[in-house]
């Protein structure tokens, strides 16, 4: 006789997070916005690809704006009031995503650019000849 299966609770537990860190990773091909608490546990995330943009449209500023809006939506329910912003990468969507975060009403403690800069490391890709 089969055992009765236990009901598994798959719903996420929503906790109040007053302060957090917003990471914007803007590459040449995509923009990823990740929102964590102070310890580094992910609260919400979004990317241009996850918002439905494909191919070259993922690297546009509008795609970054949509990704930032989608990532910030759950924060209103969880009561985040203060945040720190870490921007990484040379992509086109970094300024647009930051603009949306500023308009959202969350107080920004600081905005830091954490783009890794090599001290003459690997050879960069060659220039395109079209």
UniProtKB/Swiss-Prot annotation:
Gene3D superfamilies documented for this protein: Ribosomal protein S11
Its Gene Ontology biological processes?
Answer: translation
Q: Which domain of life is it from?
A: Eukaryota
Q: Where in the cell is it found?
A: Plastid, Chloroplast
Q: Which NCBIfam families match?
A: PRK05309.1, uS11_bact
Which GO cellular component terms, listed alphabetically, does the Swiss-Prot or TrEMBL entry include?
Answer: chloroplast; ribonucleoprotein complex; ribosome
Q: Which source organism? A: Chaetosphaeridium globosum (Charophycean green alga)
Any one GO molecular-function label of the UniProt entry? rRNA binding
Entry keyword annotation includes Acetylation: no
Q: What is the designated name of this protein?
A: Small ribosomal subunit protein uS11c
Q: Which gene encodes it?
A: rps11
Keyword Nuclease listed? The answer is: no
């Amino acid at each position: 006789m089969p055992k009765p299966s236990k009901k598994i609770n798959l719903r996420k537990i929503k906790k109040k997070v007053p302060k957090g860190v917003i990471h914007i990773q803007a590459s040449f091909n995509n923009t990823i916005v990740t929102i964590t608490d102070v310890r580094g546990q992910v609260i919400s995330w979004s990317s241009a690809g996850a918002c439905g943009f494909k191919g070259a449209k993922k690297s546009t500023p509008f795609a970054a704006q949509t990704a930032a809006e989608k990532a910030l939506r759950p924060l209103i329910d969880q009561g985040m009031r203060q945040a720190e912003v870490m921007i990484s990468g040379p992509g086109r969507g970094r300024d647009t995503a930051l603009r949306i975060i500023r308009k959202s009403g969350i107080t920004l403690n600081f905005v830091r650019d954490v783009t890794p800069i090599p001290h003459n490391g690997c050879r960069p890709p060659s220039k395109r000849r079209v």
